[in-house]
Swiss-Prot record:
Gene this protein is translated from: mgsA
Role this protein plays: Catalyzes the formation of methylglyoxal from dihydroxyacetone phosphate.
Name of the protein this chain belongs to: Methylglyoxal synthase
A Gene Ontology term for the protein's cellular component: cytosol
Biological process per Gene Ontology, one example term: methylglyoxal biosynthetic process
Catalysed reactions, as listed in the record: dihydroxyacetone phosphate = methylglyoxal + phosphate
Residues binding substrate, per UniProt: H19, K23, T45, G46, T47, T48, S65, G66, H98
Record EC number: 4.2.3.3
One family name in Pfam for this protein: MGS
Domain MGS-like: 6-152
Residue numbers annotated as active site: D71 (proton donor/acceptor)
Keyword entries, A-Z: Lyase
Alphabetical list of SUPFAM superfamilies matching this protein: Methylglyoxal synthase-like (SSF52335)
Family of the protein in this entry: Belongs to the methylglyoxal synthase family.
């Protein structure tokens, strides 16, 4: 597949997602990094977003809850180039009914080459990166060329 460049803006659009057993871990992480996160645009699946907003007072664009389609909504935003970073604390020790949605979300984040953290250590590395508040170029699939080739 041919690639093109997308610029992640200095003011990032960050998706926050956490499975039930990981919500408190994400809440603690958000509270610890609140001053920095407040400079960006936040999205989250339903329950997680409402919990974050209630605990911190931050504005969070809440989707549906993950099992009700929220993971897929976040995935769609990634595909549309509207999410720049995914922080997704998922529970690897407990299966969830919407496991296919979880796999699809992680697959889309990989396809569209956005930074992804699935644990606290990686989330800390991302948010503490010297480039976190900078505009950064990433390579993404050239969808227009892909579509043109498919329609030949």
């Amino acid at each position: 597949m041919e690639l093109t460049t997308r610029t992640l803006p200095s003011r990032k659009h960050i998706a926050l997602v956490a499975h039930d057993h990981c919500k408190q871990m994400l809440m603690s992480w958000v509270e610890r990094h609140q001053p920095l996160l407040e400079q960006h645009v936040l999205y989250a699946t339903g329950t997680t977003g409402n919990l974050i907003s209630r605990a911190t007072g931050m504005n969070v664009n809440a989707m549906l809850s993950g099992p009700m389609g929220g993971d897929q909504q976040v995935g769609a935003l990634i595909s549309e180039g509207k999410i720049d970073v995914l922080i997704f604390f998922w529970d690897p020790l407990n299966a969830v009914p919407h496991d296919p949605d979880v796999k699809a979300l992680l697959r889309l984040a990989t396809v569209w080459n956005i930074p992804v953290a699935t644990n606290v250590a990686t989330a800390d590395f991302i948010i503490q990166s010297p480039h976190f508040n900078d505009a950064v170029d990433i390579l993404i699939p050239d969808y227009q060329r892909y579509l043109a080739d498919r329609l030949k």
